[in-house]
């Protein structure tokens, strides 16, 4: 499975997930990692802290192209009474240039307010799943070879007039 958090890094990372790994008698420590008969690096195996599935990264895959761009036509600031509302919009574009289908877990986030005078409202998350307590949005998508998909992330932040917030 592939994972990406384009807000932090635009690359997709291939994640190996091994079930029934307890039967393999793996030792904790440094491991050489091979993928498709090619040495790709070293990883630390922390078997003491694993659950029923052992997960580790096999590195970046540049054949899954991801862009996260701000949509200026949806981004705005409005003043209403004693509050102001700022709308932010992002476009996530994902393209699979691999010769086979890929499954990708994509993560992004909304700001999370700890102040009752500041509210954050998701307006569009393109079918993603939102964890409101953490603000984390998760998309599970499958892309066919050559397929491109665009996802929208739009939210608004309402806060008292006169406050200066940095919202991204």
Task: Identify what each model region corresponds to.
Residues 130:
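Extracellular beta-rich ligand/substrate-recognition surface
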Residues 119-126, 136-139:
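C-terminal intrinsically disordered extensions
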Residues 136-148:
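A surface-exposed beta-strand-loop module
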Residues 1-91, 98-116, 124-127, 145-155, ...:
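Intrinsically disordered, low-complexity Ser/Thr/Pro/Gly-rich interaction regions
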Residues 13, 133-135:
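Aromatic sugar-binding surface patches on proteins
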